[in-house]
């Protein structure tokens, strides 16, 4: 079982007003009965979702609840059960998943966007920019100014790593923020971030959450996962995020606000 807070979503996009005098906007993600089964049974779901565009959603759930798989489904990288109804950024999934893949970026996923500890920050960024550029365009070496322009929206007032720094020397917060920077180089409309609590210290993790809030404030829809079921309650937010609690898998627990 899974529970979404706020309300469950209908299949059709829901109009959301952002403030007085502003036109309504559709949800970036809407789902009904979204679920995924694998060879060993239920991976996640069923869950209903309504994630407004330009907001932060925290997906909470214990190990085995399917947090990573749910995020990859929203980003068009995994295909849900056939009975699921899912629309992301105006596209029906899985039929239009290529369009979603172009507009959705991922970060924090073990085995997918891991950093190479033995290379420099500059070379890491250059490799990412080369991947995003047309095949015929040569990407020059990344200097500190180029990196600053790319990373400033993510790092904010936090001091930037030097481009000559080796990834191995970055602390866990800077490493996570670098992964976010690489993902946002795609200029996505949707960013999904897995396992935010790989930054183990609660106080230091709050820095990552504040930067994800800043990203969402620019208009990018952000969905990020964490295993701690009280993460939202004990984190100080500039604006209360949306919350989805997954309670599937071998360690199933009821959602905090379940009756």
Which positions does each model-derived feature cover?
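Conserved ABC transporter NBD signature motif
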Residues: 83-92, 100
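Q-loop/switch helix immediately C-terminal to the Walker
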Residues: 103, 110, 117-137, 146
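Helix-to-loop junction immediately C-terminal to a conserved catalytic motif
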Residues: 75-76
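The feature captures the beta-strand-to-loop junction immediately N-terminal to the Walker
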Residues: 60-62
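Conserved lysine of the Walker
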Residues: 67
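Conserved N-terminal strand/loop that marks the beginning of ABC ATPase nucleotide-binding domains
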Residues: 17, 23-39
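Conserved beta-strand
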Residues: 31-34, 42-52, 84
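Hydrophobic anchor residue at the start of the ABC signature
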Residues: 180
């Amino acid at each position: 079982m899974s529970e979404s807070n706020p309300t469950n979503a209908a299949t059709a996009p829901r109009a959301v007003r952002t403030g007085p005098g502003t036109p309504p906007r559709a949800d970036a993600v809407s789902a009904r009965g979204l679920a995924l089964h694998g060879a060993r049974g239920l991976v996640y779901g069923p869950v209903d979702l309504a994630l407004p565009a330009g907001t932060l959603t925290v997906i909470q759930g214990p190990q085995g609840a399917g947090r990573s798989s749910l995020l990859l489904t929203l980003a068009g990288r995994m295909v849900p059960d056939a009975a699921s109804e899912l629309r992301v950024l105006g596209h029906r999934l899985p039929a239009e998943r290529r369009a979603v893949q172009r507009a959705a970026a991922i970060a924090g996923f073990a085995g997918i966007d891991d950093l190479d500890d033995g290379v420099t920050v500059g070379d890491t960024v250059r490799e990412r920019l080369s991947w995003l550029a047309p095949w015929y365009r040569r990407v020059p070496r990344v200097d500190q100014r180029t990196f600053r322009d790319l990373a400033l929206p993510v790092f904010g007032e936090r001091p930037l790593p030097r481009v000559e720094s080796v990834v191995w020397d970055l602390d866990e917060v800077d490493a996570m923020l670098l992964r976010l920077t690489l993902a946002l180089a795609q200029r996505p409309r949707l960013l999904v971030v897995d396992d935010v609590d790989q930054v183990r210290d609660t106080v230091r993790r709050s820095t990552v959450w504040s930067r994800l809030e800043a990203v969402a404030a620019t208009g990018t829809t952000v969905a990020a996962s964490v295993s701690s079921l009280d993460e939202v309650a004990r984190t100080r937010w500039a604006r209360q995020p949306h919350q989805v609690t997954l309670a599937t898998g071998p360690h199933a627990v009821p959602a905090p606000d379940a009756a």
